[in-house]
């Protein structure tokens, strides 16, 4: 079991684009969700798939179990998704010793751009790049599970700066 500790931010500009080291297209579907746990399937670049179980109420730190699964199984699970299937492109950006994951959403959340950084403990805060905006760690509306199961696309995509999209 791994403990996932990550901070999440809105992205306010496209200054990160010139620093991208890799990118992957994700299709992310929730098979089950509850107040303190979720089961999701993720298909990466249409070629690989993972099943992830997250347990814990805190959005900053949760237990995470992740397993590679056959692509066909993942596609079948995605077809049985609860709510909206999320579509996004994840870009990795290195900054001051940390890897930032910048998610550019498509589909229902087109226009939303968020960045996450995994940290070693709950008090850690890495050097913040200038393209990072408001911290949204702990704001449940930006949890992928909530976005998928409650469809907040109208609320979350409103007012996103066009430069960040």
Predicted ranges, named:
Residues 1-165:
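Phosphate-end processing signature that detects enzymes handling 5′-triphosphorylated RNA
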């Amino acid at each position: 079991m791994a403990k996932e500790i990550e901070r999440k931010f809105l992205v306010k500009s496209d200054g990160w684009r010139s620093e991208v080291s890799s990118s992957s297209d994700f299709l992310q579907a929730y098979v089950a969700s509850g107040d303190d746990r979720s089961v999701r399937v993720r298909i990466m670049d249409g070629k690989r798939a993972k099943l992830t179980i997250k347990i814990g109420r805190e959005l900053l730190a949760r237990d995470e179990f992740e397993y590679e699964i056959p692509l066909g199984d993942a596609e079948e699970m995605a077809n049985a998704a609860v709510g909206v299937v999320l579509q996004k492109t994840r870009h990795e950006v290195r900054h001051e010793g940390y890897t930032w994951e910048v998610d550019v959403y498509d589909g229902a959340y087109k226009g939303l751009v968020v960045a996450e950084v995994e940290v070693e403990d709950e008090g850690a805060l890495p050097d913040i790049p200038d393209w990072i905006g408001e911290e949204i760690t702990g704001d449940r509306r930006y949890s992928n599970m909530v976005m998928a199961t409650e469809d907040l696309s109208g609320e979350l995509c409103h007012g996103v700066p066009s430069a960040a999209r």
